[in-house]
């Protein structure tokens, strides 16, 4: 194999890399990790081009910076921070390709572009890829406790960047905002009333999203992989530990 597992990723081998679980499907179900970024990016660019003259919604999920971290040869060894750094470079290229497509088609000013993550950072996530050894002083969690899978702040604080030249002035927004509130906020932006029972946990935070509200939402509820709950209100974060839980299995 070309990438050895550290824990849990030791089942079906595809593209020379052992995976989580067992997979079947024959040749048509196989893939090459090094090409995933190019394939997804090209499909997204083609979709945008095909729908440039009409309203469209595109959700684009990338493989980067998730494991297994296998960058295209264009990026392999270029960061000086190992494969984790290399796939971050690859992700940066992907974002640039999408933004360039919007610019070249002349629709960037009236397109809402959102970049975000689904969880906080994780370094060793199942493969012996030297991600931790090659951080070179970088601290992805900063000073926060926890990380991916955790209900602590480093597990749920994520990058959230919005570009919409016609609607949002460039700047930084420090007001708290939850991904759950994107649904109701976009509905408000589109003047689309939500029927009873639709996205009941989502709150309209449009002014926060647009950067005109400095207060933000009153509270944010967080949940980890083991269903441990925490709540953030102002400068206070409370995590509720159940009787059988310890600090070790929350981090």
Predicted ranges, named:
Residues 59-68, 115-123, 201-202, 221-226:
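Short, solvent-exposed turn/loop segments enriched in Gly/Ser/Thr/Pro and often Arg
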Residues 90-128:
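Metal-dependent active-site segment of extracytoplasmic phospho-/sulfohydrolases and closely related
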Residues 39, 44-87, 122-124, 128-129:
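Active-site His/acidic residue clusters
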Residues 24, 96-105, 133-199, 203-214:
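Substrate-binding rim/cap in mid-to-C-terminal beta-strand-loop elements of soluble/periplasmic
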């Amino acid at each position: 194999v070309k990438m050895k597992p550290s824990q849990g990723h030791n089942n079906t081998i595809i593209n020379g890399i052992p995976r989580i679980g067992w997979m079947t499907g024959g040749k048509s179900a196989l893939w090459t990790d090094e090409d995933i970024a190019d394939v997804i990016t090209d499909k997204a660019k083609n979709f945008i081009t095909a729908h440039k003259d009409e309203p469209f919604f595109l959700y684009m999920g990338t493989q980067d910076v998730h494991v297994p971290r296998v960058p295209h040869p264009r990026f392999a060894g270029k960061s000086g921070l190992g494969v984790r750094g290399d796939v971050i470079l690859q992700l940066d290229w992907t974002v640039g390709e999408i933004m360039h497509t919007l610019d070249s088609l002349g629709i960037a000013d009236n397109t809402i572009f959102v970049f975000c993550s689904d969880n906080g950072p994780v370094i060793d996530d199942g493969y012996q890829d030297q991600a931790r050894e090659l951080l070179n002083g970088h601290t992805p969690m900063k000073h926060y406790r926890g990380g991916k899978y955790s209900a602590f702040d480093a597990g749920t604080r994520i990058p959230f960047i919005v570009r919409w030249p016609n609607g949002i002035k460039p700047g930084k927004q420090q007001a708290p905002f939850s991904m759950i509130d994107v649904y109701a906020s976009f509905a408000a932006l589109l003047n689309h009333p939500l029927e009873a029972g639709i996205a009941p946990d989502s709150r309209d935070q449009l002014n926060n999203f647009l950067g005109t509200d400095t207060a933000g939402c009153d509270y944010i509820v967080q949940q980890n992989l083991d269903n441990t709950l925490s709540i953030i209100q102002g400068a206070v974060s409370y995590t509720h530990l159940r009787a059988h839980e310890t600090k070790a299995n929350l981090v």
